[in-house]
Amino acid sequence: MHFNLRAILGAYLAAAAVASPTPDLAARADAITSLEQLTSVITSFRNNGNPTDEAQARAIYERIVPQSSPSSMQEAVAGVKTITDANPGDIFKSGAEILLGGFAGGTYINIINAYLFTGSSNNINLRQPFPPVYPKADPRDAPYSVSESKLRAAIYIPPGFTYGRKQPLLFLPGTGVRSGPSFASNMGKLFTNSPIADPVYVNIPNDVLGDIQIAAEYVAYAVNYISGISGNRKVSTLSWSAGSVSGQWALKYWYSNRDKVNDKIGISSDYHGTVFAKLLCPGFETPGCTPAIAQQNYNSTFIRTLRNNGGDSTYVPTTNVYSIFDEIVQPQADPNASASLNGATNVELQSVCTPVLPGGAFYNEHAGVLFNSLAYSLAMDALTNPGSASLARVNAEQACAQFAAPGITLPDIFNTYAQLPIAALAIIAYQPKVADEPPIMPYAQKDIPA
């Protein structure tokens, strides 16, 4: 009964994220109700205040009264694309305008409260894996620096999880967000409603803004733990952005994961980092303002260490889907896409759908690939066939003609775009800020390029 209540309440809170703003907020004297007002407030904040002050930044977001939300998917994605194009690298201002324009489906408070359970990193998982997976599931595994209790608490297992009757599918989040909120309204929803996979959400503390090497510990443990409580059935992973990097690091240094992962599916990944990393933290000393962003600079020491000695290639069957219109990760065009790995099925949406068809159009940016029909078709194909996905097995013509994957609704798109303001505020809130990337862990120092 306890878990059913959580599911019901969680669904209610998620629905609340697309509700109208509360009358109290709209009536506040300091409510922000126009773009001109918002621009003035942000300019004043940056010129006269402390642009790194999380409390001031949060107060701005909480004052924003969303205007009438778009009435169609086409209007929603076009509006968000216009905002991100107008504010290149300014994730805070883009997030604010997404809230104001109604593209996130609700107020900032609505959004934060919508996924209290699926976004939790304080879960109670009492089942014990067999055989034990901590401190090592394989003698060759890298050592953990995080306690088993913390690693396990980050795993949110939804009500109805079948413990191996369906293939477990671990969702790995990107920078600045949690897994549940990132996926529950797109790929997570679609696979929950399918007989193919059983979603599990890995909610890494600090929103994947800390050291990615630590994030990889959460991934490595989650893979072994979920397999160990699911009859030792292999699991698969579906990751967004930096989640793909933490997953690849886990596969490289936790040998036990290679035997436990059936498929690795990456959406908008950045295995080579991104030339835009420095733009995500204006006002901070470069190359980064949080450890993870510093690590994701194109050709950072972390990235070069990951890619060296085999990390630029697959360890398990891998499918990567990405878009040239990604506003966060670049380069993202073949043959130099950051999302590409040697030996993987690497699919640039525009090379298949062209930019003319909906499946490859301009609105397929960093978050848009999460509800892209071809991306979902390829993920489904990978999970239902041996090896990685194959374009020859999917109906690419049909998928490219669709605006979003079947089953995705307008509120789902709102909830997906709501991750941008969440990430923006998480970046500002993260402490301590850094001027350089963390040192490479001792177990990986042998792979630092000379």
What residues fall within each predicted segment?
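Short beta-strand/loop motif that positions the catalytic acidic residue
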Residues: 314, 320-322, 326
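Short alpha-helix in the alpha/beta-hydrolase fold that links the catalytic acid
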Residues: 184-185, 330-337
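Serine-dependent carboxylesterase/thioesterase catalytic core
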Residues: 216-312
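Catalytic histidine neighborhood in serine/cysteine hydrolases
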Residues: 198, 341-362
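Flexible, membrane-associating and regulatory peripheral segments of lipid-active enzymes
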Residues: 3, 15-171, 397-399, 411-450
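Catalytic nucleophile-loop/oxyanion-hole region of alpha/beta-hydrolase
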Residues: 204-221
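The conserved beta1-alpha1 loop
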Residues: 170-174, 203, 240-241, 268, ...
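Short, surface-exposed "cap/lid" segments of acyl-processing enzymes
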Residues: 148-203
